[in-house]
């Protein structure tokens, strides 16, 4: 990870936050723990609502209390996660083995491996060489550099069917770029925007390609099994990719307004320095060749993960095993590039992720999340709404349902069949309504624990939980609006009836 610096590559240090922003942040930090305690106690002690099991109520209390603390930032996020795990165990929400077992989840191993890979790419200078080449060749301005990173995400989604694998490839490149620009983690608006755009681009690009994530394919199967609609690869691409690209363009423009960096980087003078740094790397070294070979093997295994079972008679190597294999190769004497002490693994993030998954999984397994969504649907009175209103409400409910469902797969499994049943009850086209909702499934972008991609980018330290929450909500609103408008325009041109 880049070291904190006091200057940018070609200009003054980033502007400090204004007094109003500082005051708000200070108040939230100061009273966050009391607010979290109040939220927890209010939910824990309230009379048990109809349809919600006692364990579900406890899980809801723990989840919302932890969420409040994560956003407030009163105490370190890993400490909040540890408190959440303790609370789950002491309240009997889940068993101790379940609560503590999240530290052994495959995503934790994936994150450890990703940090090893990142450290290897940084040490070998391969990531620096690629980043410098990319910026000096195509990134004439900081804005163009950001646009190129977004474009790369939209290209590799066709070849690497894993959101986490794509993030694991992009994060080291972003780190090196920001190191070149001397962007200070936590202070640089340019750094915040680059990392947050990485989160948004990964999610939005995935929504446009059916094979971008397993959740998309599960949704397609539900639509076929329960609604009789056959959605092919090109059907999904034609419907989803234009919406994804439009949403990304709007999100990109909004991000430039939210995180202004014009006074932070004097890029006109910095380009010559970047070109000089690129030339100074000289010929490709042995370490870079090793890193390139490991990188190529990793990308190949990730990109072919969905086809290996067909090719090798049921045998396949998952993205998690692939990542650990790559990490082992990086650490292997003679073959690799690193010693263990050189691998910059953020163990505090591992604890944070474990607690986040424990709280989120408890909410799902106890029925708390499903109860919240069901109550919201009933409370809004969807059954009495017009057709247009039903579509808009369902799309936005699906969009923001990731706030309580931490797993895209679980979210898909619960939402899509429910939406199909709702459409059939109301006499609407279940294929169109379910497909529209399916395009929201990848928008897990508002908080770090909502996806593995988020945790990988968040681990860089460039943005806070609150900053991701703000930008994520804006992006979800943009995406929901674009999908809603498209249902009544673009979908009709493609032949989908309401």
Where are these regions (language model features)?
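Membrane-embedded alpha-helical segments and adjacent helix-loop junctions characteristic
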Residues: 48, 65, 78-185, 347-349, ...
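Alpha-helix capping and helix-loop boundary segments enriched in small/acidic/polar residues
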Residues: 52-56, 74, 103-104, 121, ...
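Transmembrane alpha-helix interface/packing and boundary motifs in multi-pass membrane proteins
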Residues: 68-76, 152-162, 199-210, 396-408, ...
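Alpha-helical transmembrane segments
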Residues: 106-116, 160-168, 236-252, 432-442
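C-terminal transmembrane helix pair
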Residues: 180-186, 241, 354-359, 363, ...
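Membrane-core helix-loop-helix motifs of multi-pass transport proteins
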Residues: 181-261, 453-487
